[in-house]
Amino acid sequence: MSKIIKVIGREIIDSRGYPTVEAEVHLLGGIIGRASSPSGISIGSREAHEVRDRDNSRFLGEGVTKAVKSINNKISKSLISKNAQKQKDIDQIMINLDGTKNKSNLGANAILAVSLANAKAASKIKNIPLYKHISEINNTPGIFSMPLPMINIINGGKHTNNNIDIQEFMIQPIGAKSIKQAIQMGSEIFHNLGKILNEKGMSTSIGDEGGYSPNLKSNSNAFVLIKEAVKRSKYHIGRDITFAIDCAASEFFEESTQSYYLKSENNFFSSYEFVLFLKKLTEEYPILSIEDGLHENDWEGFSMLTNYLGNKIQLVGDDLFTTNPKFLKYGIKKGIANSILIKPNQIGSLTETLEVIKIAKKYGYATIISHRSGETEDVTIADLSVGTSSGQIKTGSMSRSDRTAKYNRLIRIEEELGSNAIFHGKMEIKNQFIYSNNNLKNF
């Protein structure tokens, strides 16, 4: 019953209106697993390669028919008659078939879609939810926890076309007692922020990840608006809600001057100066998490940032580590950052994703499961966060169904687990105890 009889690839549309890859894995007996691959817009240079057609006669060159063809021919032929329950073997077959270090032959978008579709098919064979199947192949059967969300409510950077440099301004509902309550808190603050922006005559248009994208006087102005929305929602800054940011600093790093240019500040910063800029923000606002605070290759700058803030707040590597064991191990060896963003399409298979999560946990790095700016209705990352007890999830705002689908999946999982739905909330944030005791009372 676990034997693969057919693998199908197709081109579908993602949340930005661009093509992406969807795959189906068909098993003997009629079981079908279906999954799709997301796509980023601010892409780390070390990410696994996403194969695009680059044929300008269709979809502005963004088509994925080459990746789909790889699924329908090479991948399908190599997986026929294989056992879907052996996820590691399935993924290794595709990795070997690709034959490159960054999956540039078949494409990480093709391999990941099939990898996830296979896991879904395997879970159906066992008649268990995907998160339970993931916990089993992760060798942590029966161990689950609900993630604390990072809820994106203001978009900047490459996720929209406003004048804000920092890519994501997020809230974390640390006062919540369940994922359902955390989502409620995020929704209320999101809608109150929209009302405040409207009252001030600011744009309430939304960016790629569902957050508002107004033009602001400065990056700091975003925090002021969010604080106002939190208070209007009758929550307390520091006690109920803390902040998180994704700088995506590689996007405003200028190679020619080797400096960081913030257009909203109209100023250039050296690595050291930008570290001090971030440090000051954490002193002025309850920021418990900073992602990609420096350029992906600015290891020296990241080392400085870690020295200043690494024992106080959560420092997350996204472009820095790209869900890659090699770069995570290097960061661990050098004592850089203390957390990692987990994006399955950065590495290109479920097996490799689980490997990176294990390494991070072994060395005390927090893990945050993440979406991409180009998403679909696929909710696999919700199951991944629960099945690996990763502790935190980053899946956008309280608008756009490609984002809310993941939140809704988490609500259903929590309901299904009942009294076994463990939600650690605030405790999942790296170094939150140290920071909370010394700083949050000031806000």
From Swiss-Prot:
The active site is at E209, K343. One of its GO terms (biological process) is glycolytic process. Its cofactor is Mg(2+). GO terms for molecular function: magnesium ion binding; phosphopyruvate hydratase activity. It catalyses: (2R)-2-phosphoglycerate = phosphoenolpyruvate + H2O. Disulfide bonds: none annotated. Gene3D superfamilies: Enolase-like C-terminal domain, Enolase-like, N-terminal domain. It is an enzyme of class 4 (lyase). Binds a second Mg(2+) ion via substrate during catalysis. (2R)-2-phosphoglycerate binds at Q167, K343, R372, S373, K394. Pathway: Carbohydrate degradation; glycolysis; pyruvate from D-glyceraldehyde 3-phosphate: step 4/5. Keywords: Cytoplasm, Glycolysis, Lyase, Magnesium, Metal-binding, Secreted. Its EC number is 4.2.1.11. It holds the Pfam family Enolase_C. PROSITE patterns: ENOLASE. Component of the RNA degradosome, a multiprotein complex involved in RNA processing and mRNA degradation. Catalyzes the reversible conversion of 2-phosphoglycerate (2-PG) into phosphoenolpyruvate (PEP). It is essential for the degradation of carbohydrates via glycolysis. Belongs to the enolase family. HAMAP family: Enolase. PANTHER family: ENOLASE. This is Enolase.
